[in-house]
Amino acid sequence: MSAQQFKYLFTPIKIGPFTVKNRIMVSPHGPLMGELGLPTEEFIHYEINKAKGGAGWVCMSVGYTSPRDTWFMRPNGGHFDRHIWTWQKEIIPGFKKIADGVHEYGARCSFQLYSINLGNKKGPSCIPDCNFADQMWEPMTKEDIKEYLDYHRICCENVMAAGFDGIDIHNHSGVCTDFLSASINKRTDEYGGSLENRARLLMETIEVTRKVVGKNKAIGYTLTVDDLLPGSIVPDEAVQLAKMLDKDKKVDYMFCGVGRETQSMHMYFGPHYLAPAYQMYAVEQIKEVVKNIPIVAVGRINDPLLAESLIAEGKTDIVAMARPLIADPELPNKAKEGRLDDIRPCMGDNLNCVKYMMDGQPIRCICNATVGMEHMGWGIGDMKKAATKKKVVVVGGGPAGLEAARVAALRGHDVTLYEKAKELGGQALQAEMLPGREEMGGLVRWQKIQLPQAGVKIVTGTAVTSDMILKMNPKPDVVIVATGAEWMRNAFSGQSTAEVVGWQQDNVFTPSDVILGKAKIGKKAVIWDARQDITAIAIAEILADKGCQVEILAPTPFVGSLDQIKDVT
């Protein structure tokens, strides 16, 4: 597809008082790059880089709204420390840098506010805490509600003082979401019962926001169409709520999605086991009834061609991307220029983005090593040629070796890459053979296109030895060894590095043995999930499909990774 064939994706759209240059929005996500609640240079440049890459609207997150929002507090700070404490006026100088930087590239920006029920100690009703079942929420009093609204107002004022173009109201968890949920909100006053009553706090939140931002700025709202919990937020009620918000344009644009950050996380942060655009069933229901404000679709819309088709078919007005723009913030510009093969793919693995976030660490990307390094000279267009051209030899054609070769060549070096196998890819070739993991080969496929363009000479089917390197003429100035790793047959016994007893037996195999068909498996198999990622579950699926009775053992109360796992029931 040429750039001219994008008839909709790069057309302007009206959002509130603004005309936005295209239909690509950065979906709000918390990169956890703050420090003591303040935006760092890492955070500032990370966000500006999205505008530099061509996105029309950069929506940022996570902004806690009250000192009592301490649910994520950890001994080392964790989530709470690294998210933004939006009630502090001290955020304004850093936020102004972001707003100025985003505007420099012709984009607009907003910030998403997120209140966690006054420190997750209080909620709509007296029910067990949704994250800590041994704790009970206290019902929020009218004074508590006033406190929440007062802090929300202060946060809006701070964001507006920094020159942002809008405020977003989060609704995939938090206080407004819980008040909307019939399974959580058991109140009998004006904030409980009917949908209109359960939506009252949301409407008051929007009213407070509008009083601060006025008509010259925009308000966005994240509508949970289906939170996938029994008796909670369901599509029928979400449609009614959307109509209420559409009337009189109470908000200026509306994200539509499914899932809850905690209880239905596998749908909220959909991994590659879920189809691209898997949330569109929810988005389309809202698009049918909302007539006055733009609808924003989310949920693994990871390809500009897919985004174009969704808009062309009238299923949405705008597409929001988070992980695809982490993997390649230049996706919008590259698509507009018709350079689709140059777009670095998001593989939907969730390994360094979602998992790092859930661990309370700044996010990174398994496909893009520059994430979080933009302030150190690794932003878009910042790479400089080396002062001295060198002869570089890279040994190993897996993802790491391919990336080292690509970057070295782009910096002007003479690069030759050697791989002993006939095919490039290393362990990624096995990863993409696992059930549902076909996208795991995406990075290597992209690298295979990029290396020749960068001028890398590739030699496959050649095992490199030290003698071979010593005899090279001319001798290399630099040798990069990227030979990867292989599965340990002796494994780990659990919480220590002690070997598994009996690993020398003939019936003990590695995942590679199974994937490559080298393992002789009988009718029963036991899998030891020492790594605690998706591998054990995927191997179990392979064996079960062959009629094998499988049992998985793990050192923790669950198998696999909570951040990558699909429904294993």
What is each residue range found by the language model?
Residues 1-395, 399, 403-410, 414-415, ...:
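Flavin-dependent oxidoreductase catalytic cores
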Residues 20, 210-219, 453, 470-475, ...:
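Glycine-rich phosphate/diphosphate-binding loops that line cofactor/substrate pockets in enzymes
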Residues 305, 386-418, 459-472, 482-565:
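Rossmann-like dinucleotide/flavin-binding elements
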Residues 220-224, 263-264, 425-428, 457, ...:
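Short acidic (Asp/Glu) and glycine-rich catalytic loops that position anionic groups and cofactors
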